[in-house]
Swiss-Prot record:
It comes from the Eukaryota. This is Phosphoribosylaminoimidazole carboxylase. It comes from Saccharomyces cerevisiae (strain ATCC 204508 / S288c). In the C-terminal section; belongs to the AIR carboxylase family. Class I subfamily. Residues 110-298 form the ATP-grasp domain. GO terms for molecular function: ATP binding; metal ion binding; phosphoribosylaminoimidazole carboxylase activity.
């Protein structure tokens, strides 16, 4: 796929999953970390460097063996990376050393974001770690405030919530001997996150917004998509994209945000690498965050929608697997339950179990968040009822894996009309999906559906709409697929308004329009279109036409035999 060698500073679980993605693309990787680190366990190479990613000499050894140098952890020696840019001008380093410098010190990160007009929590430096200085912080920011380590902090380590002045001595003891800063407490209702990919050319691409749930300052769960309105997701996407645009270089970035009670969004922290909140992408998205990072730093193609969910109905929950606090390896019982749960995938990192140590994660994928949560409850032991799938359900799932026809409507009030199309497609054995996509109330969802449909294997779209009936035309404007419009009869004008709206499309945006409320014909037309891809559907259509003809001929013969009066009496 690519002859260049990628050097990775750090061989933990993130490096391990970068290597997994690289292996699929036949990209060679060399790793700098301790012997038998998680990433090295799955990469049999004599070129790996045993050492520390913060040691200048070890970093230089790695640089001599690669064409592109990247990181799986930001706590690396930046001066050495800057020297390498001079010493090895052909060596590409992503993210750029300057970006790593700006981000690895969290207070400098905040100052950079403020300078670029990005909304963040109010912060102040703690020049001297003393009770007096923290009393002054409490006076300026108010209690509670968060005391944070400026560097070398992750997974909740390096944070302490100071609820009142009596807690100051404890905070100083916990965070002693490190540079500190303080943040004003953000009264958030949810913590959100998003993975942002930045290309070599500076283009940015967003993954779905997710919601993270923390326990003991460590990420426990990640819900994808986030359980917030579409409008909030859009604002979060724009905020995160603008933040990443302010940094030089390329790669993937994890952006954590606070969603406040007021509806305001604030950036919490940024990581210049793959992130825990993006692990769900391995199973839920077209491209995982790890492959996306490789595509970015190697300037490989980034096709349209490569960061989107695999299907319009994809929902996911990521559960971190932490070392049990009391019994070593007890967390593996959770993994065993996950293996018995449909739609769940287990990822273990090859790390020795220690209390609260991340040793793996579990991705749970389903067509609804409620179904994801049902599976989560079994995996975590909240319920002992195993999740079973009947033979019929398995067949349904197999049919839904790659739907060929998308049936959409602007409102559930259109479903009685559109259900006839569903019945026809079932009779013809056509796999299809059904959902609600409002052109006016959910425009972003409509756009995402139209743009992603062809990438997901959909061959044609049936769109039902009443009233203004903009849905079929708007979808047709954003997809290369054939769109069949079904005018739905409303309370006014008997559906003629819908018919005129759909049929009168401008040149260049065709919509095949059927009669008012006639989703049956829409489905039959869809089957005919599918015949161009699969001759079995043409055969089924021929059989359908013969059956129609036979039904009419039987009726004609009966009418001719008994006469019209007897025919009407017995009909």
């Amino acid at each position: 796929m690519d002859s260049r060698t990628v050097g990775i500073l750090g061989g933990g679980q993130l490096g391990r999953m970068i290597v997994e993605a690289a292996n699929r693309l036949n990209i060679k990787t060399v790793i700098l970390d301790a012997e038998n680190s998680p990433a090295k366990q799955i990469s049999n190479s004599n070129d790996h460097v045993n050492g520390s990613f913060s040691n200048p000499l070890d970093i230089e050894k790695l640089a001599e063996k690669c064409d592109v140098l990247t990181i799986e952890i930001e706590h690396v020696d930046v001066p050495t990376l800057k020297n390498l840019q001079v010493k090895h001008p052909k060596l590409k380093i992503y993210p750029s050393p300057e970006t790593i410098r700006l981000i690895q010190d969290k207070y400098i990160q905040k100052e950079h974001l403020i300078k670029n007009g990005i909304a963040v929590t109010q912060s102040v430096p703690v020049e001297q770690a003393s009770e007096t200085s923290l009393l002054n912080v409490g006076r300026d920011l108010g209690f509670p405030f968060v005391l944070k380590s400026r560097t070398l902090a992750y997974d909740g380590r390096g944070n302490f919530v100071v609820k009142n002045k009596e807690m100051i001595p404890e905070a100083l003891e916990v965070l002693k001997d490190r540079p500190l800063y303080a943040e004003k407490w953000a009264p958030f209702t949810k913590e959100l996150a998003v993975m942002i990919v930045r290309s070599v050319n500076g283009l940015v691409f967003s993954y779905p917004i997710v919601e993270t749930i923390h326990k003991d300052n460590i990420c426990d769960l990640c819900y994808a998509p986030a359980r917030v309105p579409d409008s909030v997701q859009l604002k979060a996407k724009l905020l995160a994209e603008n933040a990443i645009k302010s940094f030089p270089g390329c790669g993937i970035f994890g952006v954590e945000m606070f969603y406040l009670e007021t509806g305001e969004l604030l950036i919490n922290e940024i990581a210049p690498r793959p992130h825990n909140s993006g692990h769900y992408t391995i199973d839920a998205c077209v491209t995982s965050q790890f492959e996306a990072h490789l595509r970015s730093i190697l300037d490989l193609p980034m096709p349209k929608n490569f960061t989107s969910f695999s299907t319009i109905t994809t929902n996911a929950i990521m559960l971190n697997v932490l070392g049990d606090k009391h019994t070593k390896d007890k967390e593996l019982e959770t993994c065993e339950r996950a293996l018995a749960t449909p739609g769940s995938s287990v990822y273990l990192y090859g790390k020795e179990s220690r209390p609260n140590r991340k040793v793996g994660h579990i991705n749970i994928i389903a067509s609804s968040m409620a179904e994801c949560e049902q599976r989560l409850n079994y995996i975590t032991g909240r319920t002992d009822i195993p999740i079973k799938i009947s033979v019929a359900q398995k067949l349904d799932l197999e049919a839904m894996v790659k739907p060929l026809v998308g049936i959409i409507m602007g409102s559930d009030s259109d479903l009685p009309v559109m259900s006839a199309a569903c019945a026809v497609l079932k009779d013809f054995g056509v796999p299809f999906e059904v959902t609600i996509v409002s052109a006016h109330r959910t425009p972003h969802r409509m756009s995402a559906y139209a743009i992603s449909a062809s990438k997901r294997g959909i061959k044609t779209i049936i769109a039902g709409a009443g009233g203004a009936a903009h849905l079929p035309g708007m979808v047709a404007a954003m997809t290369p697929l054939p769109v069949i419009g079904v005018p739905v009869k409303g309370s006014c004008l008997d559906g003629v308004d819908s018919l005129h709206s759909i049929v009168q499309m401008p040149r260049g945006v065709p919509v095949a329009t059927v009669a008012i409320n006639n989703s049956t014909n829409a489905a039959l037309l869809a089957v005919r279109l599918l015949g161009a891809y699969d001759s079995s559907y043409t055969t089924k259509m021929e059989q359908f036409l013969l059956k129609q003809e036979e039904e009419v001929l039987v009726k004609a013969q009966k009418l001719e035999t008994v006469g019209y009066e007897a025919y009407l009496e017995n009909k």
